[in-house]
């Protein structure tokens, strides 16, 4: 069992999942993970399915050199985006694993939110490609480690409505005297 970089605030109301040395591009996976951070579990799964079907886009904000401009990215407040299919599939599988962990712990799956998701670089894997004039160049892959923590969202309690029974705001003697003078006039 590997270590997580962050421990959840309430361990009984959260679940974890992680993947190590995943053969999927680090940069694409990082941008996809940033897009689903703080989403509910159901919304994130639906979003990743839409990315695979090219109905929703992943905004590329940090690793955006050479990334084309797309109209769908306007929904995210940026101009550049892509549909990283393999990254979306890997993250979807990881969310499914976290969901089954939550189900095993007896958590309410419909109230789960992605509290923490992190993508780290893994050791590069080396291959070679053959070039002209007998040269050989490296042909590296950029795998990654991914960890996700889902937490149950707390029930939102409505704020109390202001009633007539509520205590009135205190006023200074000076202010009360001024109001009495204003009422006489």
Swiss-Prot record:
Cited PROSITE patterns? RIBOSOMAL_L22
Q: Where is this region: Disordered?
A: 157-185
Positions with biased composition (Basic residues): 169-178
What the entry lists under SUPFAM superfamilies is as follows: Ribosomal protein L22 (SSF54843)
Q: Which GO terms describe its biological process?
A: cytoplasmic translation
Q: Which Pfam families match?
A: Ribosomal_L22
The UniProt entry's GO CC annotations, sorted and at most eight, read: cytosolic large ribosomal subunit
The answer to whether keyword Ribosomal protein applies is yes
In the record, what terms sit under GO molecular function? structural constituent of ribosome
Which terms are listed as keywords in the entry?
Answer: Ribonucleoprotein, Ribosomal protein
Q: Disulfide bonds, which pairs?
A: none
Give the signal peptide range: none
Indicate the transmembrane segments per the record. Answer: none
Cited InterPro entries: Ribosomal_uL22 (IPR001063), Ribosomal_uL22_CS (IPR018260), Ribosomal_uL22_euk/arc (IPR005721), Ribosomal_uL22_sf (IPR036394)
Q: What family name appears in the similarity comment?
A: Belongs to the universal ribosomal protein uL22 family.
**Protein's name in the database:** Large ribosomal subunit protein uL22
């Amino acid at each position: 069992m590997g270590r997580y970089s962050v421990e959840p605030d309430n361990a009984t109301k959260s679940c974890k999942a992680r993947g190590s040395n995943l053969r999927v591009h680090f940069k694409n996976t990082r941008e996809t993970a940033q897009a689903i951070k703080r989403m509910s579990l159901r919304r994130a799964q639906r979003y990743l399915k839409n990315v695979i079907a090219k109905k929703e886009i992943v905004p590329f904000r940090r690793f955006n050199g050479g990334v084309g401009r797309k109209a769908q990215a306007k929904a995210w407040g940026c101009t550049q985006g892509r549909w990283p299919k393999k990254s979306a599939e890997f993250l979807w599988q990881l969310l499914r694993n976290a969901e089954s962990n939550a189900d095993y712990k007896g958590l309410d799956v419909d109230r789960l939110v992605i509290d923490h998701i992190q993508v780290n670089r893994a050791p590069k894997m080396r291959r070679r490609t053959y070039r002209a004039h007998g040269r050989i160049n490296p042909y590296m892959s950029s795998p990654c480690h991914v960890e996700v923590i889902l937490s149950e969202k707390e029930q939102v309690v409505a704020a109390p409505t202001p009633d007539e029974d509520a205590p009135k705001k205190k006023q200074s003697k000076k202010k009360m005297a001024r109001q009495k003078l204003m009422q006489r006039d």
